[in-house]
Amino acid sequence: MSRRPQPGVLAVIAMAGALGASAVAGATTVPDPGECAGTIRFGAAVSETGRYEREGKDTREGYQLWENWVNDEYGGIKVGEECFNAEVVYYDDESDADRVANLTERLITEDEVDFLLGPYASDLTMGASAIAEQHGVIMVEGNGASEAIFERGFKNIFGVLTPGGDYTRSALEALSAAGAETVVIAYEDAAFPTSVAEGAERWAEEFGMEVLATESYPEGVTDVSAIMTNFRDLDPDVFIGGGHFNDALLFIRGAEELGFQPGAMIITVGPSNPEFVAELGDSANGVIGPTQWEREMTWEDEYFGTAEEYAARYEEAYGREPTYQAAESTATALTLQIAIEQSGSIETDAVRQALLDMDVVTFYGPINFDETGKNAAKPMGFIQIQDGEIRLVGPAEVADAELQYPLGE
């Protein structure tokens, strides 16, 4: 049964929006949920099982943290002078592109959600956002970094994260300055890793580095030894691996078994997750990982406070440190909330325009969308695992440790 606002509620929203009323964070009195004018429903198909289940868990927890905060502490979403409860409807997409498309259709047509929060992974976001576009429903996402998502002329997809093509930019610039000259790239043949690899080739050339080889591999592989053997024989300064968490483990274990020891290893997704260090132990030391967010970063907002304060809140709720996937998921929902509040409406056209006009800084970083829906304002950071600790080494203005290069020296 749908809980979306009824016609009378929509009239209240429209009238309040016309009056230009707005709300700010920090209300001294949090209304009882029953005192709000209605409920705004958000739909989220996330990976609770399958190959993306680790990242999917982080995604769901990020959404849940926002949902609990906005209802229990913030006092509901402020639309004009009224408050509205937030409800997120979840389904397990099983890390499957066909299933996420079907579930997105279900969320729109059966559950009658008002807005959509994106799934984890670019390939799933591609399909889900296509269904959203067909129905004219806004989707804000924080876990699909492939530029291809935003190159289809869609009006209703907005991504808060730094695009995949820029994942390695900061790290390659720093490594080039440290003397690295040659690069090899391995990537999974899927939307996000392809975007990372194409960007890495572009930025390596920009920084005067030679790409010795680029090789792709199919989704779901369990052995990358052939690629790593070829790369070992090329003796590059830098190895770049584009994939997801399990791929990151394969790269490190494969390199170790084959005696492949480049001066630096940049690997997406895995290294910034404490579970990566826990699984690999000392083998993780020295690995560099692009990161969308870390608790040491200096961004803050009036909602969750500083990045550190957000991290502490997450730890209290879930008993572990937040990954950047969790943080960007919370930021996704927060961004949609801000757009609703700034527009004074839940009507699609008004909220879409508020997203296009948005220029804010959150605990996760700056949010400013270009005409395609990409966040054009947010830089990418990078970490390095040093003595078993995840240390922020770039960009330099927010780093808490110095880059170690080359490894073994």
Predicted regions and their residues:
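Extracytoplasmic ligand/sensor domains, especially the bilobed periplasmic-binding protein
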Residues: D98, E110-E215, A264-G289
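Short, low-complexity disordered leader/linker segments with a strong preference
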Residues: M1-R41, Q404, G408-E409
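Beta-alpha junction/loop-to-helix N-cap segments that form part of ligand/metal-binding clefts
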Residues: T29-E35, R54-E61, E73-F154, V160, ...
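Segments of small-molecule ligand-sensing domains
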Residues: R313-A326, T335-V393
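Short, solvent-exposed loop/beta-turn-alpha elements that line the ligand-binding surface or hinge
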Residues: Y74-E81, T298-D301, I367-N368, D387
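Extracytoplasmic "Venus flytrap"
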Residues: V30-T39, G43-W66, Y91-A97, Y120-D123, ...
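Extracellular/periplasmic periplasmic-binding protein-like sensory domains
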Residues: A255-T330, I390, A396-G408
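Hydrophobic alpha-helical
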Residues: S122-S129, P236-L258, T332
